[in-house]
């Protein structure tokens, strides 16, 4: 496996059999202080390289376009995993083996949710607005409703994000 220099793996999720997860870190040489679309274009090669390092087929990567809302969608396609952009979506969930989920975050939090019993997982983009709207609760409710998950079985991991004392927040 290539270098994991720009990848963070979380021990609580790494302990779960069959779950591949990662938080791709910012590359210090890529300038992202610009418009969103330009920044995403600049990051594209870096992200593809990191996905390949993890053995993730980007043709099987579902993503949302992060609108700071509370919509969570199931990404369980018929006929196999697909590369899909889910518009107006901040959360994704699946039970499909080989279906990868991705969200982009800058200062917002990425919340990983995994159910080792039902072998379901979700990934949400949760900034201030999404947190106030209850996006993580929405994802858990969807997992309970669609996959029969018991909230007591869930492992939840919050990725690095802005927070006190480094930033003043009013939640």
Residue positions per predicted region:
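Active-site microenvironment for binding and transforming phosphate-containing groups
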Residues: 1-171
């Amino acid at each position: 496996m290539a270098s994991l220099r720009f990848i963070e793996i979380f021990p609580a999720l790494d302990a779960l059999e069959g779950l591949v997860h990662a938080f791709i870190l910012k590359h210090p040489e890529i300038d992202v202080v610009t418009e969103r679309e330009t920044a995403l274009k600049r990051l594209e090669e870096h992200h593809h390289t990191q996905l390949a390092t993890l053995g993730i087929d980007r043709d099987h990567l579902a993503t949302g376009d992060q609108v700071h809302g509370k919509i969570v969608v199931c990404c369980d396609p018929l006929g196999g995993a697909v590369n899909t952009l889910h518009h107006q979506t901040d959360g994704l969930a699946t039970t499909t083996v080989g279906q990868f989920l991705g969200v982009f975050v800058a200062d917002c939090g990425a919340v990983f949710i995994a159910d080792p019993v039902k072998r379901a997982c979700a990934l949400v983009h949760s900034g201030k607005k999404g947190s106030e709207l209850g996006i993580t609760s929405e994802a858990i409710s969807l997992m309970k409703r669609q996959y029969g998950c018991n909230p007591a079985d869930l492992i939840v991991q919050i990725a690095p994000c802005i927070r006190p004392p480094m930033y003043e927040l009013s939640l």
